[in-house]
Amino acid sequence: DKLWTRTNIRKNLGYEGPVIFSEHHESHAASAFFPSPFQEAAILTMDGVGEWATSSLALGKENKIELLQELHFPHSLGLLYSAFTYYLGFKVNSGEYKVMGLAPYGKPIYSKLIRENLIDLKEDGSFRMNMEYFDFLGGMTMTNHKFEAVFNHPTRNSETKLTQKEMDIASSLQ
């Protein structure tokens, strides 16, 4: 269907002019900056993944947005959060709010483990995920046995009762 988007737009709308697409993070930046009351602003966008960008830093000034930096797939806070969503037994792309909701009931006792093993936070605010712990590149799951070993606990089955451990992991991620 995506291959025929331009054709379908022209056919369904009776439109003959050019059809232009913007990049995913560019759209996020524009929808945040242009309706804002600011003439100049720093713009930070972060989500799972757009085309290849997962995070972007831009400068909005008057009627222009200048891209300053991008992080690219697979290094993504959105995908990191989805990996934890999966590991904690919730459905990816719909259960992330449950992880956020669990966080206040836990203690961030695993934060150091997460930083030491799963994500490398850089001085400039960027980050790199340690892909040895994740399976979303080619596997059928978000995480793998090495991820489970970090927490000394298997991936939670969605039918099992939540424990303090899951709450502490959610708090540590948050």
What are these regions (language model features)?
Residues D1-Q174:
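Short acidic/glycine-rich loops and adjacent helix/strand connectors
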